[in-house]
Structure formats: structure tokens, C-alpha cells
């Protein structure tokens, strides 16, 4: 029995706006250079790479009221939410190539919205180096 998988939509989100150190913004290109699209295709999956989203630059400022770069984080996540939601509406499986951990705000919001509108159960696979459970009251860094 052959399974029918949706097209994979690679969405690059090259930002380190929610991180305390530079480098996460290189993630999408590093994954592409490492051959993520070819690795998926070699497993029989159809892949569409939509390139990178373009968002605000990182001002590298200290936290304000417990949050670092809140307006920029909001904008990157609005862009991410729109791209992921559009991908789901095209019947694709979005794979967000980040970027830093704050992108869960936009990507998971898009999936939750899509699932709610279509009577589907929300499922998220999150791959990260560590758990990111901070609030403005407990974060030592101000990272969102």
C-alpha cells in the first residue's frame, strides 16, 4: 500500500530576532546547503521551496519591559503565520526553516487556526535545542 503524502512546503524564516545571540538567521540557508529538499525528495516526497520571508532587521537592543524586540518579533510572526496558513490552505505540509525559537508563535497560531476552521485535531512536531518556556517575569534574557 502506497501512502499519499501532501507536498512539503519549505518556508525559510531567517531571523534571530527572538534570540540573544547571532546566528539563528543562517538556519534556513544552512539547511538548504545541507540538502534538506533533496533528502525529502529522495524519500519520494514532493517538495516546493518558497524561499525566505523578508522581515525587519534585528536591532540588537536590550529588553524593554521584559521583552526584547517585541515589535520585530510580532512582525516576523505575522509573516510566518500568513505563510504557514496559506500553505495549509493549498493542501501542503509546511516545514518552517528557522530562525530562532520565537517562530513558534506564528507557525503554531497558523496551524491552530487552520485546524479550528477545518474541524481537524491540532498536531505539532517541534524540533529545538531546548525548551522555551519563558514569560516577561521569569526570562533572564528578555528573549521571546
Language-model region placement:
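Conserved alpha-helical scaffold segments that buttress catalytic/binding sites
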Residues: 2-144
Amino acid at each position: 500500500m502506497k501512502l499519499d503524502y501532501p507536498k512539503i512546503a519549505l518556508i525559510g524564516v531567517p531571523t534571530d530576532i527572538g534570540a540573544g545571540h547571532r546566528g539563528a538567521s543562517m538556519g534556513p540557508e544552512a539547511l538548504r546547503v545541507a540538502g534538506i529538499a533533496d533528502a525529502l525528495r529522495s524519500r519520494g516526497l514532493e517538495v516546493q521551496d518558497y524561499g525566505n520571508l523578508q522581515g525587519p532587521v534585528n536591532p540588537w537592543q536590550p529588553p524593554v519591559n521584559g521583552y526584547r524586540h517585541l515589535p520585530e518579533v510580532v512582525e516576523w510572526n505575522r509573516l510566518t503565520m500568513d505563510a504557514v496558513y496559506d500553505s495549509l490552505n493549498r493542501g501542503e505540509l509546511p516545514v518552517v526553516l528557522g530562525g530562532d525559537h520565537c517562530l513558534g508563535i506564528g507557525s503554531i497560531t497558523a496551524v491552530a487556526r487552520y485546524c479550528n476552521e477545518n474541524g481537524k485535531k491540532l498536531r505539532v512536531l517541534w524540533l529545538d535545542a531546548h525548551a522555551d518556556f519563558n514569560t516577561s517575569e521569569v526570562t533572564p534574557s528578555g528573549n521571546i
